[in-house]
Amino acid sequence: CYDDWGDFEHVKRVDTGLLGAELTTDQASGKYKISKIYAGENWNESRRSPLTEQGVNVKEGDYLIAINGTELNGSMNPYELLENTVGKTAELTVNSKPETSGAKTYTIRPIASELELLNLNWVMERRKMVDKLSGGKIGYIYVPNTSTDGNRELYRGMYEYNEKDALIIDDRYNGGGFIPDVMTNLLERKTLSYWQRNGLSAMKTPGIAHNGPKVMLTNGYSSSGGDAFPYYFRKKGLGTIIGTRTWGGLVGMSGNAGLVDGGYISVPQFGIYDENEQWIIEGVGVSPDIEVVDRPEQLAKGIDPCIEKAVEVLLKQLQDNPVKKVNAPAPPDRSKWNEQMK
């Protein structure tokens, strides 16, 4: 399955601090310009965006004049000045003009990786895309894995899009995990009853449930639990699968003992089969109901073919079978209850 080294010396890495932003060189002034600042979730350390934290008034389009007092020009690499700043603070001097006069200096905390911010940006772009294409009727939930993060994002999305007519569940690039069945059960929930509290909006039981149509997106990087998730989704009849065939890897390993030198060798230990006593998914994957290939040249232009097809399919389903909106009835005349019970 997998192996890893033991008592080998590891090269000590030099951590370079990152800003959660894109820098471009302004040819006219020879200064660096902050062309994009990635939005973050600053309560979550893995998604913290340094330039959006409280007290840091840096905007897209500002010029990065200096780092830790060293003035920058276009021939310098700004990240050299951010070496060994992870877990520490750094001073950024910025200005709306490419000059030092009127510049302001902010103390920020650089981050070690921008991967989560880039992923969050990708997700937010698709949320906006779905909202625009569907006229606000469809919600979009990206599920990065079938473990802690994926379960959290699914719950958050189900809360946020509780009132949407339809849902897109994006399983593309899903890294797997051990709870795809739990997540599928959440998608399967239907509303059992409604509650009207005086003066407030109606509530429902269960609090997280969605009654409308759903689509799941897959690709060749939907792996392990990301294979099982669409398989269970289809088996429960929850909706249409769109995209390309999944990775096809559900022979697994767990609990392998380590070796004496600190390394390990993991051995395949279990595989998946169905009620017909047939081995499934491994080496084959889960094929979509509608095949759509995400062409690189289209993605580079900001086009997401799977998203567009999913919206098209769901809007057609909503047109053919509109979701019934359940409204609270008029308040009951409780004086007549005794008569009604006779």
Regions picked out by a protein language model, each given a short descriptive name:
Residues 94, 282, 300-301, 305-308, ...:
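Conserved functional hotspot residues or short segments at active or partner-binding sites
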Residues 24, 93-97, 273:
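A generic structural motif
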Residues 21-44, 58:
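Active-site-adjacent "gating/activation" loops or surface patches in catalytic cores
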Residues 128-129, 222-224, 259-291:
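Metal-dependent DNA phosphodiester-chemistry modules and their immediately adjacent helices/loops
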Residues 1-27:
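Extended boundary segments
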Residues 291-298:
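C-terminal or mid-to-C-terminal helical accessory/interaction module adjacent to the motor/catalytic core
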Residues 6-12, 33-35, 41-52, 65-263, ...:
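Cleft-lining beta-strand/loop regions that shape enzyme active-site pockets
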